Regions:
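Active-site neighborhood of glycoside hydrolase catalytic domains
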Residues: 1-118
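Conserved, mostly hydrophobic/aromatic
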Residues: 13, 85, 137, 145, ...
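Stable alpha-helical elements in mature extracytoplasmic
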Residues: 39, 43, 96, 130-133, ...
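Active-site proximal loops enriched in glycine and acidic residues that flank catalytic Cys/His/Asp
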Residues: 60, 89, 111-116, 146-150, ...
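Short, charged, surface-exposed secondary-structure boundary motifs
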Residues: 95-96, 119-124, 258-260
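Generic recognition of flexible, low-complexity loop/linker segments
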Residues: 96-100, 132-135, 211-215, 226, ...
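Carbohydrate-binding surface patches
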Residues: 194, 205-242, 249, 253
Length: 260
């Protein structure tokens, strides 16, 4: 409510960031049973009593423990307050999002954190994040993709004690002067966020190991296709939409966003 009074709407919260990582600061380990109990006995009723519509999203940790989200969602009392589950990809496979979706199709899926370590290998980091997150997460039912973090100084600050000491911001802001540098995650997100506007929906496109891709239909009727050449050589490919076909070529490791 205090944030709302300042003009900032909190769309969603998770009970705890990375509940199976006790090494962040502040942090503590939280089991799936404890999270479910907290949601159904405290957080959910408190939101309900205050008339808050802010979403409660469970898990908020890696893809190697999809069972955690499923255990929270299987708790009837907790599930009544839970909008969906959130994932990171520091371990596991992005297909875990589909595993949870298939078990609980009425609940939403979100991708809520991945950082680029500094100093970045631009080409390698761009390809990995686009492959797994910008393309992989929506293909596995995620409604969003968040990169962490928005901005840092040249020494990767500020961060909490015990927090990430080499997380490269999308922007590096100089500690003196006005210099702002755009980094890898700026371009990772820009390939989608500039074109796939809120209200867009994913539409079907043919999967390929060489030309990774994901397609969207925007609210104003435009089609957006994000493609990555995941091979080691220049790759020709075709885009067919209804009766129209266009032939294109993409260099090794290149990413492109196409709009029509």
């Amino acid at each position: 409510k205090a944030m709302k009074a300042l003009g900032i709407t909190i769309d969603a919260v998770t009970p705890q960031n990375e509940p199976q990582n006790p090494y962040n600061n502040p942090s503590m380990q939280l089991s799936s049973g404890q999270e479910a109990d907290f949601i159904k006995s405290a957080l959910g009723p408190a939101f309900q009593g205050a008339g808050l519509t802010t979403k409660i999203i469970c898990w908020d940790h890696n893809c190697d423990q999809a069972s955690y989200a499923q255990e929270v969602l299987s708790d009837v009392g907790a599930s009544a307050f839970v909008d969906g589950s959130a994932f990171h990809l520091y371990a596991g496979d992005i297909s875990a999002l589909s595993t949870v979706h298939n078990a609980y199709p009425a609940k939403n899926i979100y991708f809520t954190e991945q950082y680029v370590a500094g100093p970045s290998n631009f080409g390698g980091d761009l390809a990995w994040h686009v492959r797994n997150l910008i393309i992989g997460a929506p293909r596995n039912w995620s409604r969003n993709v968040l990169e962490w973090n928005l901005a840092s100084d040249p020494n990767y600050n500020p961060h909490t004690p015990g927090g990430c000491s080499n997380c490269l911001g999308a922007l590096t802001i100089a500690t003196s002067g006005t210099l702002v540098s755009r980094n890898t995650s700026y371009y990772i997100i820009a390939h989608a966020s500039k074109f796939v506007r809120p209200g867009s929906v994913r539409i079907e496109s043919t999967a390929s190991d060489k030309i990774r891709n994901v397609a969207f239909l925007t609210p104003d009727g435009k089609k957006v296709l994000i493609v990555l050449n995941d091979g080691g050589a220049t790759q020709p490919f075709n885009i067919q939409y209804q009766s129209r076909v266009i032939s294109l070529t993409l260099g090794a490791g290149d990413v492109a966003t196409l709009v029509w």
